[in-house]
């Protein structure tokens, strides 16, 4: 994964682990996380310090809903999301399919106070 600034310069890149699923019925789901996330010291899913919760939230993205495909874009119609502001949104992704790899790129989005575009390469797993 890499993110680029408004001027096209690289902002950040790094490995992410996750799944992107598209069903033949028109539903999609995506969950991915940065590598090396720290476990909560307490081991309690509702526990954790404020800092642990912030780090956990900032290192994970998840949403699901319906999808629509056009010639060069796929639109995710978000129904559930870790980030509540995305619920009900229609988010467009530019796509490129090559062999067993799908590259999705976002238009500019507000991330950490900056306008960034994200580019993720997904690899097909066993059919």
Residue spans for each PLM region:
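Lipid interaction determinants
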Residues: 1-63, 69-127
């Amino acid at each position: 994964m890499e993110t680029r600034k408004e001027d096209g310069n690289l902002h950040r890149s790094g490995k992410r682990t996750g799944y992107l699923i598209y069903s033949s019925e028109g539903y999609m789901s995506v969950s991915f996380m940065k590598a090396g996330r720290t476990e909560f010291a307490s081991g309690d899913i509702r526990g954790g310090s404020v800092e642990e919760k912030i780090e956990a939230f900032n290192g994970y993205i998840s949403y699901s809903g319906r999808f629509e495909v056009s010639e060069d874009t796929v639109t995710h119609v978000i129904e559930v999301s870790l980030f509540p502001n995305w619920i009900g949104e229609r988010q467009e992704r530019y796509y490129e399919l090559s062999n067993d790899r799908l590259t999705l790129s976002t238009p500019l989005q507000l991330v950490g106070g900056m306008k960034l575009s994200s580019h993720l390469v997904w690899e097909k797993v066993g059919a």
